[in-house]
Curated annotation (Swiss-Prot):
UniProt xrefs under Gene3D superfamilies: 2-enoyl-CoA Hydratase, Chain A, domain 1
Domain of life: Bacteria
Its biological purpose: Cleaves peptides in various proteins in a process that requires ATP hydrolysis. Has a chymotrypsin-like activity. Plays a major role in the degradation of misfolded proteins.
Record gene name: clpP2
Subunit and partners: Fourteen ClpP subunits assemble into 2 heptameric rings which stack back to back to give a disk-like structure with a central cavity, resembling the structure of eukaryotic proteasomes.
GO biological process, one term: protein quality control for misfolded or incompletely synthesized proteins
Reaction(s) this enzyme catalyzes, per UniProt: Hydrolysis of proteins to small peptides in the presence of ATP and magnesium. alpha-casein is the usual test substrate. In the absence of ATP, only oligopeptides shorter than five residues are hydrolyzed (such as succinyl-Leu-Tyr-|-NHMec, and Leu-Tyr-Leu-|-Tyr-Trp, in which cleavage of the -Tyr-|-Leu- and -Tyr-|-Trp bonds also occurs)
Protein name listed in UniProt: ATP-dependent Clp protease proteolytic subunit 2
Chief place where the protein resides: cytoplasm
Entry annotation: catalytic residues: S100
Organism of provenance: Streptomyces avermitilis (strain ATCC 31267 / DSM 46492 / JCM 5070 / NBRC 14893 / NCIMB 12804 / NRRL 8165 / MA-4680)
Lineage: Bacteria, Bacillati, Actinomycetota, Actinomycetes, Kitasatosporales
Statement: the UniProt record of this protein carries the keyword Magnesium: no
């Protein structure tokens, strides 16, 4: 999370005052905030939160707010698979940016529950290679793995955006940046929000 201080929220209850860090307070409202690069540690925390919230109430919506530059493909897929595994409906919100692997999480929300805030951006690009080194046979294996990873990302995005693989491959050949409106038109999200949805 960097070196900045995580704010606390103080609540008054009949038993007295109780202090939470803001992320725990959001979790009590069934909100998960993903605001960092995605690595194994971040993925494990998000997965634990998803499983906890499903266990508490498998029918009540879980909201994931995303402001992330992306990150590890395996970490992304661990979160994505858990999102599809749990019974609870999943809504996704892009605030700031959902770049690279984070864009897949945005698109992976339940149909009709994928939102992007008005001035956010979404970026599609090829999964990072990580600057691999090694013998020729090692590099050959790594190249095959990168092709497999790219194919998996394309298949997931095709499922959620309704674009064919060839279109996605061409669009992801270089980084492609979408405004909020363009992300909706492309099928990465369902609606642009400028204000919170009314509670009914």
């Amino acid at each position: 999370m960097g070196s900045y201080t995580i704010p606390n929220v103080v609540e008054r209850t009949p038993q007295g005052e109780r202090s939470y860090d803001v992320f725990s307070r959001l979790l009590s409202e069934r909100i998960i905030f993903l605001g960092t690069e995605i690595d194994d540690g971040v993925a494990n925390v998000v997965i634990a939160q998803l499983l906890h919230l499903e266990s508490a109430n498998p029918e009540h919506e879980i909201a994931i707010y995303i402001n992330s530059p992306g990150g590890s493909f395996t970490s992304l897929m661990a979160i994505y698979d858990t999102m599809t595994f749990v019974q609870a409906p999943i809504s996704t919100f892009c605030v700031g940016q959902a770049a690279s692997t984070a864009a897949v999480l945005l698109a992976g929300g339940d149909p009709g529950r994928r939102f992007v805030l008005e001035h956010a951006r979404v970026l599609l690009g090829q999964p990072a290679s990580g600057g691999r080194q090694g013998t020729v046979s090692d590099l050959s294996l790594q190249a095959k793995e990168m092709i497999r990873i790219r194919s998996q990302v394309e298949e997931v995005l095709s499922r959620h955006t309704r674009h064919d693989i060839a279109t996605l491959r061409a669009d992801m050949d270089r980084d492609k940046v979408f405004t909020a409106q363009e992300a909706v038109a492309y099928g990465l999200a369902d609606e642009v929000l400028s204000r919170r949805l009314a509670v009914v």
